[in-house]
Amino acid sequence: MAATCQVTGAVPGFGHNISHSHRRTKRRFDPNVQKKTYYVPSLRRNVKLTLSAKGIKVIDARGIESVVKDILARGVKI
């Protein structure tokens, strides 16, 4: 899925638009997903990740090495 965070696993949510007359139409709530490139010294290369805003904060807090290690342990190809 394109709108999925590789760190947090955030995926789109679904709900309704509700008009003034309370008619409901289906809609999708997408996470704030960005493509971001990081240099990973242990791999000696750049890694391009699809991240939500929260995922970027997780990398800032824990470090890219720790996060990439967890992603690879889950078997996700990066």
Curated annotation (Swiss-Prot):
It comes from Clavibacter michiganensis subsp. michiganensis (strain NCPPB 382). Keywords: Ribonucleoprotein, Ribosomal protein. The keyword Ribonucleoprotein applies. InterPro entries: Ribosomal_bL28 (IPR026569), Ribosomal_bL28/bL31-like_sf (IPR034704), Ribosomal_bL28_bact-type (IPR001383), Ribosomal_bL28_sf (IPR037147). One of its GO terms (cellular component) is ribosome. GO terms for molecular function: structural constituent of ribosome. This is Large ribosomal subunit protein bL28. GO terms for biological process: translation. Belongs to the bacterial ribosomal protein bL28 family.
